[in-house]
A protein has these predicted regions:
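Hydrophobic alpha-helical transmembrane segments
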Residues: 1-48, 52, 60-197
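Glycine-rich phosphate/dinucleotide-binding loop and adjoining beta-alpha-beta core of small-molecule
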Residues: 57
């Protein structure tokens, strides 16, 4: 399962939006945040982060089965992702410029819609993605058979199309490359300081 929403009733546009949103969120959760924690704390901190993030993905849903345990995983994940999500958003804005996407709109939508999500972090990168691609993401969706009313992210400057998935992937790759370079320099700097002590 890549997305948490119910997929049975999704049409091509719904599947595309879900995929693009997943790429946006995983730019932070799956790439930039682990690199950030690797840079500042080495492998131990990176694996701790990934453990918490995986627990949130598996049991962080608001349902009766995981309510007590999942709540703590979700809150800790929110705390650990607070800084990396914002770094990811700015790396994606730079990546949008390098990819030739709409970086000005990415900044505009980021500033306006970055809190249009129940999580304090998820819409950070989704807002940049929506703005960079000139599309509208999020909105109402079904989870575990129940309709969840959610605000939209971005403006529908143009309709969502399946080609937005490779565009989203391109933005992920460029943002990841930028992050890898920056965090490698930070990690080398920290290791250099440690050897001097």
């Amino acid at each position: 399962m890549i997305v948490g929403r119910d997929t049975q009733s999704l049409d091509e546009i719904g599947v595309t939006k879900a995929a693009v949103e997943t790429v946006a969120e995983n730019t932070s959760d799956g790439i930039i945040a682990p690199l950030f924690y690797m840079a500042i704390g080495g492998p131990v901190l990176m694996f701790f982060y990934k453990g918490v993030n995986t627990m949130d993905s598996m049991v962080g849903y608001k349902n009766e089965k995981y309510l007590n345990f999942g709540r703590y995983a979700a809150k800790l994940d929110d705390i650990l992702n607070y800084i990396p999500a914002r770094i990811s958003a700015w790396l994606m804005i730079a990546g949008a410029k390098l990819c030739g996407f709409d970086s000005k709109n990415a900044v505009k939508i980021f500033k306006r819609d970055r809190y249009n999500h129940a999580s304090p972090n998820s819409a950070q990168t989704e807002a940049v993605m929506a703005g960079a691609l000139d599309i509208q993401l999020a909105g109402n969706a079904y989870y575990f058979g129940k309709l969840c009313e959610k605000p939209t992210i971005g403006d529908a400057i143009r309709p969502v199309e399946k080609e937005d998935i490779p565009r989203a992937n391109q933005l992920l790759y460029v943002s990841a490359a930028l992050g890898t370079g920056i965090f490698a320099v930070i990690r080398l700097g920290i290791q250099g300081l440690i050897t001097l002590l």
